Amino acid sequence: MGKKISQLNRNELPYEGNELVAIVETAETRGGTLSSFMNYLSGAKYGTAQDSPIATPLANNFFQATQSVVGDLSASGKLVIGTSTVVGTLASIAGGTGNTASGACATIAGGESNTASSNSSHVGGGKSNAASGVCSIVGGGCGNTAGTGTCAVVGGGDTNTASGHTSSVLGGTTNVTSGGGSIIGGGLKNTASSNYSVIAGGCYNIAAGTSSAIAGGGNNRTTGNYSTVGGGLSANACCNYTAVVGGYNNKATDLYAGVVAGGSNTASGLSSFVGAGAANIASGNAGSVAVGGMSNAASGLSSFIGGGKSNAASGCGAV
């Protein structure tokens, strides 16, 4: 007479896998090894109509139905959520589709077709963004790149590029920060190409001088180091320590020269100054001044013109 299950000797752990287990198959009781059953169970798909396997912590499990976890979820390796790809060591993707985190410790929070390809790089979301520099960040937007330079940042916007070391583009469209530590706040097609250069906004502006700044406007240039353009259109501060506050087509072309406003004014002498008006020129060195008016020329050393039209101060200290 057979024994009841309660009468059998107790099992002993750990199992080696070659223990025999009884199973009914095609109306016949058959024996199989424990390892053969576990191989089947761990290789099956979860949530399908034909399979009802048991999950195992010793193999990769594939669930096709909704799962709920009560409590904490932790992982010592990679984390992938959504239809995305993780390649980098300890990289993680929290959601979205078509994302790739190939850098070590790289992360992507979500979005579509984003790439974090360098170590410790991060993409927050958006579409077709790329964080390719070490410790670089793209917050969101579309088609943005934080690459080449270490710790480069793009906050958002469209088709912006931060390639300089520790450079940043906060937003806007098609802006480029290629200088180390350079910053663009926003706008359209602005370029901060020199170290520590800054463009707050506007369009088609270029800050090419070291530590130069453009506040706004359009088609403005700072090619001198430590030069500044406040705004306006087509202004050029093209020598060191020069400034153009605003206006149209104004230029400061010698050291310490400045133009405040107006149109087509030029301060081309050392420490020269044009206040406003149109087509005025202060070309004399040692602080020549044309305050306003039209077509005036202060070409003498320390010369001065207050206003009027077509006046010339060509002698030393002429007024």
Set out the residue ranges of the language-model regions.
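Periodic small-residue-enriched repeat registers in elongated scaffold domains
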Residues: 70-319
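Short, mixed charged/polar active-site loops
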Residues: 29-31
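Extracellular/surface-exposed low-complexity repeats and stalk/linker segments enriched in Gly/Pro
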Residues: 1-14
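Short non-domain terminal segments
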Residues: 13, 35, 44, 60-61, ...
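Register-specific beta-strand positions within repetitive beta-rich fiber domains
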Residues: 1-3, 19, 25-26, 35-38, ...
